[in-house]
Amino acid sequence: MAKTSNKVKRNANKANIFKLLADNRYAKFQYEISETIEAGIELLGTEVKSIRNGKANLRDGYCSFRDNEILLLNVHISPHKNVGSFFNHDPLRNRKLLLHKKEIIKMKSSTEKKGMTIVPLNLYLKGSWIKLTIGVGKGKKLHDKRQDEKQKSIKREINSALKR
């Protein structure tokens, strides 16, 4: 019988650890998210350092298709402060998302419907890898947002009444 080493066990435990680095609460308010997928991102070294320091902003980000690839556009990752300007990255550059071909086809078919778009939701560490959760969503109208706010306030009131 083969014996598993302690190193393998430690690495398996590290893969289950999640650390949230950036969250797009604005997208959850603006869009009605119907489907989510976890994707990897193609990053430069200075981008990884900045993201680990919490210097990423997903608020205005969205995804686009080009040559059977999904690109992450308009996501701001601040330049790393301890690196010279020659070696630093462009904060708003387009970044390729790493997905399987079937997942790309599925996302593309779901966004062909009118009003559907792909937005980044969360940026987090999974083990030592930086992952991004993207979601397919449809933009909410003003009255939809108001209804959501009413439902949240009703839930808050019910929970506070139950705690008493």
From Swiss-Prot:
Residues 145-158 have a biased composition (Basic and acidic residues). It is found in: Cytoplasm. GO terms for cellular component: cytosol. HAMAP family: SmpB (MF_00023). This is SsrA-binding protein. InterPro entries: SmpB (IPR023620), SsrA-bd_prot (IPR000037), SsrA-bd_prot_CS (IPR020081). Required for rescue of stalled ribosomes mediated by trans-translation. Binds to transfer-messenger RNA (tmRNA), required for stable association of tmRNA with ribosomes. tmRNA and SmpB together mimic tRNA shape, replacing the anticodon stem-loop with SmpB. tmRNA is encoded by the ssrA gene; the 2 termini fold to resemble tRNA(Ala) and it encodes a 'tag peptide', a short internal open reading frame. During trans-translation Ala-aminoacylated tmRNA acts like a tRNA, entering the A-site of stalled ribosomes, displacing the stalled mRNA. Keywords: Cytoplasm, RNA-binding. NCBIfam families: PRK05422.1, smpB. Gene3D superfamilies: 2.40.280.10. It holds the Pfam family SmpB. GO terms for molecular function: RNA binding.
